Amino acid sequence: MAMDFIRIRGARTHNLKNIDLDLPRDKLIVITGLSGSGKSSLAFDTIYAEGQRRYVESLSAYARQFLSVMEKPDLDHIEGLSPAISIEQKSTSHNPRSTVGTITEIYDYLRLLYARVGQPRCPDHGFPLEAQTVSQMVDHMLTLDPEQRYMLLAPVIRDRKGEHAQVFEQLRAQGFVRVRVDGELYEIDAVPPLALRQKHTIEAVIDRFRPREDIKQRLAESFETALKLGEGMVAVQSLDDATAAPHLFSSKYSCPVCDYSLPELEPRLFSFNAPVGACPSCDGLGVAEFFDPDRVVVHPELSLSAGAVRGWDRRNAYYFQLIASLAKHYKFDVDAVWNTLPAKVRQAVLFGSGDEVISFTYFTDAGGRTTRKHRFEGILPNLERRYRETESPAVREELTKYVSQQPCPACNGTRLNRAARNVFVADRPLPELVVLPVNEALNFFRGLSLPGWRGEIASKIVKEIGERLGFLVDVGLDYLTLERKADTLSGGEAQRIRLASQIGAGLVGVMYVLDEPSIGLHQRDNERLLGTLTRLRDLGNTVIVVEHDEDAIRLADHVLDIGPGAGVHGGEICAQGTLQDILESPRSLTGQYLSGKRRIEIPKQRHKPNPKMMLHLRGATGNNLKNVDLEIPAGLLTCITGVSGSGKSTLINDTLFTLAANEINGASHTVAPHREVENLDLFDKVVDIDQSPIGRTPRSNPATYTGMFTPLRELFAQVPESRARGYSPGRFSFNVRGGRCEACQGDGMIKVEMHFLPDVYVPCDVCHGKRYNRETLEIRYKGFNISDVLQMTVEDALRLFEPVPSIARKLETLVDVGLSYIKLGQSATTLSGGEAQRVKLSKELSRRDTGRTLYILDEPTTGLHFHDIEALLGVLHKLRDEGNTVVVIEHNLDVIKTADWIVDLGPEGGHRGGTILVSGTPEDVAAHKASYTGQFLAKMLPSVKARETRPAAMANKPDARPPRKVKPEKVAKATKTATKKTAKKKAS
């Protein structure tokens, strides 16, 4: 009998509290609850892990050793599982060769299509490389004007130097009467002597004729003779019209003009990962690295002597003496601002003097001077040479700061070699197709109709390509291009690509486990995504989704609410069943938010911007941005909204953040193209909080990441017993020798490799999982040793360390961002995406604040429940109220409706986006008819506009200054002033 339920008994993975539940099979199940309540522990670490483990164990022991087998979950019993496929938020491959096309396998089908029905052309002359039969050649000639006279030519010599007397002898011996030499017709006995050192082309005249039906046989014989003599190449030239282009024929797969040929087309010719297809200059990467003048001249507003080019100023005697000699030769002042120097001088300094010899004065070790004349190498060639010749990783890393990337000049960034770039299907080469947005590519293939045998072969391949492109459109990724690099995709995009690939596989009877597929998706596209999930279910699969999105919860066949709290306070089932069951459950927080008993309130009054304190970014043109001018009010909470692919990340992460980090923090990021920026001096610090993991090793934990572990170790080193023994703070680190347990090297666990079974981690039998040796554990603070402290939750630790300000401040900020339940020593690899981002946020909050920080957050609501979002908004509003500027890229309407200012990009994704539709308050955006964000926002805002009374907190600060163009010296001065003022306040 077929099982109708997945039965789980006694699940205790991570924080799950011995739960029993029955989940219906072949249904869409949504698991929801607070961040850290145990959703992923149930969905991924229990259900998926056991489903995958059982399937893998059905394979042979030999096969199992090549597969990663997940750890066996801690539970009593589970039944009714199917083979499991997980689609997680993890970003895709960081391999620069991985693209949207290769991940979805669409590119593999495109390679097959071009190899089987592609028509190669000569890269130089554009002629199709087609092998024609004699019959086809004759038939073509018979279509020409029968009144015109033509001659049939066989090319014997092509562009070769020499007198070629022996060639004429051979032709005469074979009975040929006329030849054409370099375009001139001669009797064979009257050919003038040819110049020895010039290139010549010699063609034998095989026949002269008028194309009529009655000479068909003669023409065929003439063509056969010509092909034999011309090694498969024939030309037919009009005798009556010398200016007419010749008709060229080839019996082999080659260009009739230059004899360029290709071997038989194979799919690997179109692979940029195979040597036969990759561009030889960039090895198929599509980019070339070069030393960028804009990165080398760090401060163009300074002079060469003051440090316009780092390392070539007065502080470096050797390089500066070269500059001084150059200045003498070209008659320029080393103290003149770089931007004011003549173009010729700047060219010579950066790229060298070319053939011009310059007299250089060098200081000798003895203190004397010596003069030598030679060419000047140039700063950029100097860097290139040092980069090429050095064997020191440190030097190479230092020089990498000056390197930028540009599209490979040989292949124009297409990654393929000449041959592959010149194969056409319906007059389009492969590189032209992969740069099309997915929806345009889909339209192309839907309209593709090839004649004859090509059409028959192409139909099956095109069907597969069309289906896969259609699935990408269904999950809201119609704006992506197939050549987009995988490492530039957001977590949500990467997950939806994998989802599209799974639908393309069309499996039945499988259990899919998904982690928040709605991340990064605008409300407009949500419906299509949910349709995709229901289609997966309707195929006959069980779809388990960890999700916070209201629409997804309402659509589910079965909802599971885990809680009531997070961490140690969660791990229980608060409610399960249909949507109605959840709404009626008094224990379900989710139900209370869905029913409207609880909700995130709209602020009663919005902060209004101060027109004198606006950050201006003008002329942004990165990726799909269309000369965008961005205004962000300082001291407010600004939301950047827009459909997926509209240009939000390019504008904020790639342009604004990189620019601000370079100017204010002294970073060296590559900035997306823009024209100018004004008023960056309103800020003294810029902080970017993204969703990347806080650590990729089990040794990284919240205590080490937030910097709390250092004062903790210092505190333990100050305990009287510790001082008596002479212990330093390093004694309490599990990363270095001294205080850690050397049997497990401070891991607390020992890994036992089991080959074809999952690796087993057992507690170290020396320290019993405590990570430290016995002597270190004897040191106690208020009865707790360092291992006990690492096992504490944040809230317990706060009670213990309240009297220690340096530790308490960091613990308080972890509580503020809703992470009171995590353990101080919890491995960073076990934190969810939302938790990792909030640990980062707490780290920034715990730093001393000047009230002039620019915070940039990319979808901070990822992995957060309605209740968590309310707490997060409290933190963001607190930052704003202290005068800081908070810029958030967000799709969540609860965050958007509480913002002071919104910048909405659109109208669509990809090349149909990239413009700012509307900027203003949420009410302004809701009133804008063209804005998709506005349409959804209007449903959440009351009809009466919120009163705009309170000015921005930052506007009243004494630091406020009128707008002006940013200069690095002024940024430094502003920072210094702010620091002094803060110090004065503290003193008073």
Curated annotation (Swiss-Prot):
Family: Belongs to the ABC transporter superfamily. UvrA family.
GO cellular component: cytoplasm; excinuclease repair complex
Positions with a binding annotation for ATP: 33-40, 642-649
Domain ABC transporter: 312-589, 609-938
Comp. bias regions, Basic and acidic residues: 958-972
PANTHER family the record matches: UVRABC SYSTEM PROTEIN A
Biological processes, Gene Ontology terms: nucleotide-excision repair; SOS response
Biased composition (Basic residues): 978-988
Keywords: ATP-binding, Cytoplasm, DNA damage, DNA excision, DNA repair, DNA-binding, Excision nuclease, Metal-binding, Nucleotide-binding, Repeat, SOS response, Zinc, Zinc-finger
Subcellular location: Cytoplasm
Role summary: The UvrABC repair system catalyzes the recognition and processing of DNA lesions. UvrA is an ATPase and a DNA-binding protein. A damage recognition complex composed of 2 UvrA and 2 UvrB subunits scans DNA for abnormalities. When the presence of a lesion has been verified by UvrB, the UvrA molecules dissociate.
Chain segments annotated as transmembrane: none
Biological source species: Xanthomonas campestris pv. campestris (strain ATCC 33913 / DSM 3586 / NCPPB 528 / LMG 568 / P 25)
Protein name in the entry: UvrABC system protein A
GO molecular function list: ATP binding; ATP hydrolysis activity; DNA binding; excinuclease ABC activity; zinc ion binding
Keyword Zinc set for record: yes
Record has Secreted as a keyword: no
Zinc finger extent (C4-type): 255-282, 741-767
Start and end residues of each stretch annotated as Disordered: 948-988
Description of how the protein assembles with itself and partners: Forms a heterotetramer with UvrB during the search for lesions.
HAMAP family documented for this protein: UvrA (MF_00205)
